[in-house]
Amino acid sequence: MDNKLEKMKKLVEELNQYAYEYYVLDNPSISDKEYDLKYDELVILEKETQVTLPYSPTQRVGDKILGEFSKYTHKGRLWSLDKAQNMEQLIEWHNRNLKVIEQYNSMSEDKLPELRYIVTKKFDGLTVNCTYDENGILIKSATRGTGIIGEDITAQIKTIKTVPLKIKNNHVIEVHGEAIMTKTAFEEYNKAAQVPLKNLRNGAAGALRNLDIKETARRNLSAFFYDVGYNEGPEFKSYREMMNFIRNMGLPQDKYIKECTNMEEVEKEIEYIESIREELDYDIDGAVIVVDDIKTREILGYTIKFPKWAIAYKFEAKEITTKLLDVEWNVGRSGRVTPTALLEPVELGGVTVKRATLNNMDDIKRKNVKLGAKVLVRRSNDVIPEIMGVVEESLEESKEIQAPDRCPYCNSHLVQNGVHYYCENTLSCKPQMVKSIVHFASREAMNIAGFSGKTAEQLFERLDIKSISDLYKIRKEELLTLDKFGDKKSQNLIDAIENSKNCDLASFIYALGIPNVGKKTANDLVMKFKTLESIKNTTIEQLVEVPDVGEIVAKSIYDFFEDEKIISNIEELLNLGVKPYYEEERIDENPFMGKTIVVTGSLNNYSRGEIKDKLQSLGAKVSSSVSKNTDYVLVGEKPGSKYEKAIELGVKVINEEEFSNKIK
């Protein structure tokens, strides 16, 4: 029995260390298979001995559903933070601190040091308090609650794999952190969720307030820790020392921690945090600025609600509520009919928002969105805002959104395929034909210079262009009948159409508008199969062998080339003189061949598209995110969080000059 217990202790220590390496350091030292074997061995030993250590990894997810939440009194108070909405308010706070310190130093021989601040991100999640006992074992986790009394969420916190169940510490401490849901976890959860989550914060809060622990685990939460609220061990002299302690205990901690000695430096860091906000895989809603020196904190003291030595700088909201006035149905080039929400105008992120995305009727029903109701709107980057959910209290006088049964443009009957509605009138439905022609003529496709959406509309309405192949039948005399088409413009378009006949195969494949096939996938298909005939006759099994092509994309490609009408149109294009060609490019040996490269920041000699093309021409794979599998990160001016991630993981970083020298 003793041998088995010793073996269990060893396995638990090993598995917890492996989990720390995998989830926190992102640097695993063993394979998943080896981990699983050790985990299974531990499960067997626990069954045999009927003993389970409180910090065993098997205790992270239980089968039971809890009856209710119990209260927990925090050993140390969890304070709220005062807020600054602009730099003027932040400078006022700084000046108050200076005044108190000057007064103290004028009256005391034990002088306080010059003010130094620590700037960190303000995470938009749920504040949690984790208590570790004198043996380093996690014995309690709780919500902030009133700051004095919270709710016990120990079982829920144990589902967060980055939170250690045991730390190497021999005195009681309480550690404060923020439980968050990453964008990656949010998207994965919503793919299979019957009721999709509205936003990341609700996802995290709902998980920790759920009595079904398995549901909490399904949310796949993360956490960052940033404060020791109660400590029976040696006192800290500075916040930097406290943060080092938190990190050394193996608690997950954000890498961004900046020291500042004046407000100019603080402002610069705030601007930087805001600039990388959208690149992060989690939500932040501001920056936190705290006094570093602990004794100075004691002198500054507290108000009834806030510590005077800390403040939060709040960024502009990315979400807001407004009224849904109506729904507009639009037709894409594939014939898919999609809804767009028409909103009561509202300011969000410095922009007046009047429209928002509603993906499909299934999305509308799951989110319970109704006409006249108040909806939660989110805007990320510069993309069209999306409706994330509805304010339940506003539903009383709202009306159901009705799915259309006819095309809003050509009045044809719609057919339902999965969650989407389609107009099958491909020949005379204006939006479909116009968008298909514009896509076919675009720069990355057939590159027909001087072609525009307005030109496509005139070709459809005035020259009766009903298919892509009809483009190659247009005569100059016909173009002269169109608005704003003189002799020169007409001849230029005729020449551009003629010149497009000699095109590379990847551009032709992309121009065809195969569902789910972008330019990269088109390039990958050509690299794999070499000829149009081979691509047309390939199987789903062969298609999934192409990099980044899964079963859904493979089926889209296969079904596309099974359509007799499409094959007929392709044959007509070839008969009209379109000659797609493929020349296997010989790539000379170079340092980037076969390497995975991430680009961040602005480059002097390349646009983002140009550097991507250049790297691919060198045989490199261009990735959008940094991981331990990244070979190089090419850094330009004002790099984002990808640069920090590269430094953290030890990935080779090169600038534009070094890149140019390597390819000479």
UniProtKB/Swiss-Prot annotation:
Name of the featured protein: DNA ligase
Domain BRCT: residue ranges: 587-664
HAMAP family: DNA_ligase_A
Keyword Zinc: yes
GO cellular component: cytosol
Keyword rRNA processing in annotation: no
Annotated organism of origin: Clostridium botulinum (strain 657 / Type Ba4)
Cofactor(s), by name: Mg(2+); Mn(2+)
Cross-referenced Pfam families: BRCT, DNA_ligase_aden, DNA_ligase_OB, HHH_2
One BP term from GO: DNA repair
Binding locations of Zn(2+): C407, C410, C423, C429
Binding locations of NAD(+): D32, K33, E34, Y35, D36, S80, L81, R144, E178, K314
Encoding gene per record: ligA
PANTHER family given in the database record: CHROMOSOME TRANSMISSION FIDELITY FACTOR 18, DNA LIGASE
Cited function: DNA ligase that catalyzes the formation of phosphodiester linkages between 5'-phosphoryl and 3'-hydroxyl groups in double-stranded DNA using NAD as a coenzyme and as the energy source for the reaction. It is essential for DNA replication and repair of damaged DNA.
